[in-house]
Amino acid sequence: MSQYWSQLVHTLTPYVPGEQPKVDNLIKLNTNESPYPPSPLVLNALSSQLNDKLRLYPDPSSEDLKQSIATYYGVESNQVFVGNGSDEVLAHAFMTLLKQDKPILFPDISYSFYPVYCGLYEIEHQTIPLTDDFKINPADYNIENGGIIFPNPNAPTGRLLPLQAIEQIVQQNASSVVVVDEAYIDFGGESAAQLVLRYPNLLVVQTFSKSRALAGLRVGFAIGDKALIDGLERVKNSFNSYPLDRLATAGAIAAIEDEPYFQQSCEKIITTRDTLTHFLEDNGFEVIPSAANFVFTRHSEMRAEDIANQLREQAIIVRYFNKPRIDQYLRITIGTEEENTQLCRALTDILKTQNA
C-alpha cells in the first residue's frame, strides 16, 4: 500500500492466477494448460522469426493472423480482433462494450476475472445463480441489463451450454451485447462464432492457450460484427497499438495451419478426460459433465481441500477454490495418459488411507 496510489487502486481486488511452481518433477494439473507441446509447425515458425527484423515493430493490426482466423471461422477479417491473450481481449470488451449505465450480468460461479474487470473499470454487475447442478438457465438472463458475459464451457465447472440456448440469450437481449468466452470450446462444444453473422450484438472470444498449446505466447481473439470490432480497435489503439509481437503472430498462424495436429491433441485430451471421469465415478466421486480440458469433481466422504493437500504431498497440484458453493470441489486439468495414471494411483492411495 502506498500514499501515491490512486483511490481506485485502493478498491481493487486483483485476480489471483493459478500457481506456477518452479519445481521439477511436478505433475501440474491446476491451470488448464495443454499437456502436449505446440505443433512442430509452430516451433519452425518461431525459429524463422529469429532474425534482424526483431528490431522492427510488428504489424499493429496483425492482419495476417486476422485473415487466418477469419478464413478458419468463415468470417471477414474486419470481424476479427486479436490481443495479448484472451484476458486482454476480454478487458477491452469490458471497457468497450460492457461499461454501460445498467448492471452487466454473469454467473455467480464463473471466471473470477469478470468481477476484477468490473472493479477496474467501475462497472456495476449482477451475478446470476447457476442452478443446483451448475447449469445456466437462459430465462434468468431475460432481465434488464447493460450486457451479458459467460464462459462456454463454463469455468470452473466445465458444463456446456448448447448453441440453441446461447442463441436464446442473444435473441432476448437484442439491445445489449452478449459476450461468450470460449476458452475451452474445442474440447467438446460447438462454437457460437457461426452465429455472429446473424446477431450484431454477439461477441465470441477465444484463446490459443488451451487447445493449441500456446499459453506461453499469449494470443487471444474475438469474432463479432464489424461495428463491435471497430470499437475494440479504438480502445486497443488508445492503450497499446502493438499487443502481439512477431513471434506470437507467426506461432498462432502456424497453429491454425496444422489442423491435423490440433485435432489429434484435442482427441487425446478428450479420451483421457473420459478415462479419468470413469475412474473418479468408480471411486466415490461426483463429476460434473465436462466439455473442457478439466473435470470438476467432489468426493462423497472427503473434503476437497484435504484431497488437494494430500495430492500436493505426492507432487501433484490440482485447483481448489475456497469459495461458497464450490468449496468441496476440485478442478483437475487433464494431463497426459501417464500423468493421469499417476493421479489415479495417488487418489487410490489417499482413499485407501481414508478408509483404513
From Swiss-Prot:
Keyword hit for Protein biosynthesis: no
Cofactor(s) needed by this chain: pyridoxal 5'-phosphate
Pfam families linked: Aminotran_1_2
Gene Ontology biological process terms from the UniProt entry: L-histidine biosynthetic process
Pathway annotation from the record: Amino-acid biosynthesis; L-histidine biosynthesis; L-histidine from 5-phospho-alpha-D-ribose 1-diphosphate: step 7/9
Keyword Cell membrane listed: no
Entry EC no(s): 2.6.1.9
CDD domains: AAT_like
Modified residues (N6-(pyridoxal phosphate)lysine): K210
EC top class named in words: transferase
GO molecular function: histidinol-phosphate transaminase activity; pyridoxal phosphate binding
Keywords associated with the record: Amino-acid biosynthesis, Aminotransferase, Histidine biosynthesis, Pyridoxal phosphate, Transferase
Catalytic activity: L-histidinol phosphate + 2-oxoglutarate = 3-(imidazol-4-yl)-2-oxopropyl phosphate + L-glutamate
Listed PROSITE patterns: AA_TRANSFER_CLASS_2
HAMAP family tied to this protein: HisC_aminotrans_2
Subunit organization: Homodimer.
Family: Belongs to the class-II pyridoxal-phosphate-dependent aminotransferase family. Histidinol-phosphate aminotransferase subfamily.
Protein name from the UniProt record: Histidinol-phosphate aminotransferase 1
Species this protein is from: Hydrogenovibrio crunogenus (strain DSM 25203 / XCL-2) (Thiomicrospira crunogena)
